[in-house]
Amino acid sequence: MAGTVVLDDVELREAQRDYLDFLDDEEDQGIYQSKVRELISDNQYRLIVNVNDLRRKNEKRANRLLSNAFEELVAFQRALKDFVASIDATYAKQYEEFYIGLEGSFGSKHVSPRTLTSCFLSCVVCVEGIVTKCSLVRPKVVRSVHYCPATKKTIERRYSDLTSLVAFPSSSVYPTKDEENNPLETEYGLSVYKDHQIITIQEMPEKAPAGQLPRSVDVILDDDLVDRVKPGDRVQVVGTYRCLPGKKGGYTSGTFRTVLIACNVKQMSKDVQPSFSAEDIAKIKKFSKTRSKDIFDQLARSLAPSIHGHDYVKKAILCLLLGGVERDLENGSHIRGDINILLIGDPSVAKSQLLRYVLCTAPRAIPTTGRGSSGVGLTAAVTTDQETGERRLEAGAMVLADRGVVCIDEFDKMSDMDRTAIHEVMEQGRVTIAKAGIHARLNARCSVLAAANPVYGRYDQYKTPMENIGLQDSLLSRFDLLFIMLDQMDPEQDREISDHVLRMHRYRAPGEQDGDAMPLGSAVDILATDDPNFSPDDQQDTQIYEKHDNLLHGIKKKKEKMVSAAFMRKYIHVAKIIKPVLTQESAAYIAEEYSRLRSQDSMSSDTARTSPVTARTLETLIRLATAHAKARMSKTVDLQDAEEAVELVQYAYFKKVLEKEKKRKKRSEDESDAEDEVEKSQEDQEQKTKRRRICPSDAKEGDSYDPYDFTNTEEEMPQVHTPKATDSQETKESQKVELSESRLKAFKAALLEVFREAHAQSVGMNRLTESVNRDNEEPFSSAEIQAALSRMQDDNQVMVSEGIVFLI
């Protein structure tokens, strides 16, 4: 037995010597010697080693490292500590252990959670997946020091479990007494702890077999690897696959829980901070100077080139990506700089496609849908921790998208309670939680881009925008811009769209020949942490314009060039940093245009507002003008920026409402027939038309086509063909009749009872007259009813319109 231990020690020392020779490569290329020096200067203790380099120098040792990870990694880490001590002895004493992280090509050991089987136990594997869950970071004791006051001795105890590289786990009993039953005091300052976190990685949905649920695996992160990732990140985790026995009632069952003990974590998703070279900065400066006149239009045209038209919407989305300037005033108030946009329109007008483009372009973007997300899922939820049973906060989509964009599709399918939850986020940029003993405030400074369908499925142009949208004013005022996107029947437009869509379907990626079979399934999987065909030169050389493709971009026009997506991403990232200042001229213009917007809806008869014009609209104009100035890389918000912002708001805030002319003609013919039957004179008819010009619309038309009447007025409609002269006579009589206060009070009580019985906010005039006089000893005449209603209308208690009484 002793010989075996000695043999193991000999093998361990031999492995340690091999790894030390590999690290000490001064005579070769000196790669790892320079890496260790960088590690010391950066005050780090984990060295990332490429398996390909080890395989090139010592293939046998590389194979043993991948297949017998625990013993080999212990030897490798000891060799690293010896090598660090040879370079800087004082630095080596600062840390008890130095760690090795692996990267490179793993071949058959590059797996997904589904293909991670028992044959990979104790091997180094590379697993790809999406992070679905992250536990809290907790301290884990590595070494505890205890002092005995009675004997004045110090006791030290080390702890190791199955998640560490040590072969045999130690006892987890924390000592409180020594061998002679003397009490011990823990010296917390001398004890050593390490950070510990557990994350769950799930198989990528595109790589899961059809019709099967994606599988997941738990990953243990220690020390410097904690908090490297967050839920939703696509990652590659390199680590050792190990099984942990599960004890139940003192017995170990035959099935084991498996975990991955990570030694390196690498993000696969695009970086929040794109890498810039000096060449990129020079290109961005040159582009902003040479195209200073039409740079905003040029960038807006290049947004989502696969979508035809929607020029104003693309300009607004560019403003959303650039954002305004956020301000925190001295009195504690906060002025948001994020721009929120709502797209409402018919099906198949590319609303969801625009959202998908923003997801690909914005540095941080979180997608959600109206039906699949709740209020707490968007803001923050209080959950119970599985390990400790404590209550803790879990961030929602808007908190995760802090300083980014939240894209909400099918916004109209959300319930009113869930929509109310995002009110605070959209204006204040934060989430306040006060429940289950937790009071917290989380930052959620994100822009909201939402898409919704109208109330009736398709947009009804004969109804006002507010009736079509069907959302509360308190929510609509928080959206800076609301666009109504219609699917209109225009032969010329339809021809252009069909030509564009057909070109998109005929487009083939570069390198594919026409007529070649399209590959089934996904592209070829790269079984390495880095793409072997990737060269750093490709990353640095970012082209400003895309190469023209007749299928992708259509027939080439003289001055129309498309900015490439990579350059657009970098340009937006640089432009967002600029904080332009309003000039006196632009501030005066915005103030003047704001007052004009407030009064515009009362002047124009055939247009209606899509959302209320409030004081928030003034801030919207400032934010849009600031975003336009950022696109020009300007330090000031000039008059041209303010004019562009006003043009966007004018387009988004007002929508034309059509009138049903054919039906109006038909109704007027019916009216004339009714008047002939009653044998009205020509003079009375002229007086009637004069009065009709004064009132907004005809009474009969209102009775038959009123959207607000929820009572059974349809049964009464045929009876409302009496000539309108009686109404005019009643109004004349009502002017003569003076109603006493007691009669008015009795009428108000009877009217309230009528509304209560009807369970509605509106009642027809005929039904009102019958109900008021039903059980009344002193019935009201029609003149008294008209006089009482006019008095109540003056006091803003009711509203009478087109023969229907509305309760305010």
Swiss-Prot record:
Residues 662-739 are annotated as: Disordered. This is DNA replication licensing factor MCM3. The keyword Phosphoprotein applies. ADP binds at Q353, L393, E394, A395, A397. The gene is MCM3. The keyword Glycoprotein does not apply. The modification N-acetylalanine is found at A2. It comes from Bos taurus (Bovine). Its EC number is 3.6.4.12. GO terms for biological process: DNA strand elongation involved in DNA replication; double-strand break repair via break-induced replication; mitotic DNA replication initiation. A motif (Arginine finger) lies at residues 477-480. It holds the Pfam family MCM_N. InterPro entries: AAA+_ATPase, MCM, Mcm3, MCM_CS, MCM_dom, MCM_lid, MCM_N, MCM_OB. Acts as a component of the MCM2-7 complex (MCM complex) which is the replicative helicase essential for 'once per cell cycle' DNA replication initiation and elongation in eukaryotic cells. Core component of CDC45-MCM-GINS (CMG) helicase, the molecular machine that unwinds template DNA during replication, and around which the replisome is built. The modification Phosphothreonine is found at T713, T722. The lineage of its organism: Eukaryota, Metazoa, Chordata, Craniata, Vertebrata. The modification N6-acetyllysine is found at K293, K547. Component of the MCM2-7 complex. The complex forms a toroidal hexameric ring with the proposed subunit order MCM2-MCM6-MCM4-MCM7-MCM3-MCM5. Component of the CMG helicase complex, a hexameric ring of related MCM2-7 subunits stabilized by CDC45 and the tetrameric GINS complex. Associated with the replication-specific DNA polymerase alpha. Interacts with MCMBP. Interacts with ANKRD17. Interacts with MCM3AP isoform MCM3AP; this interaction leads to MCM3 acetylation. The modification Phosphoserine is found at S160, S275, S535, S611, S668, S672, S681, S728, S734.
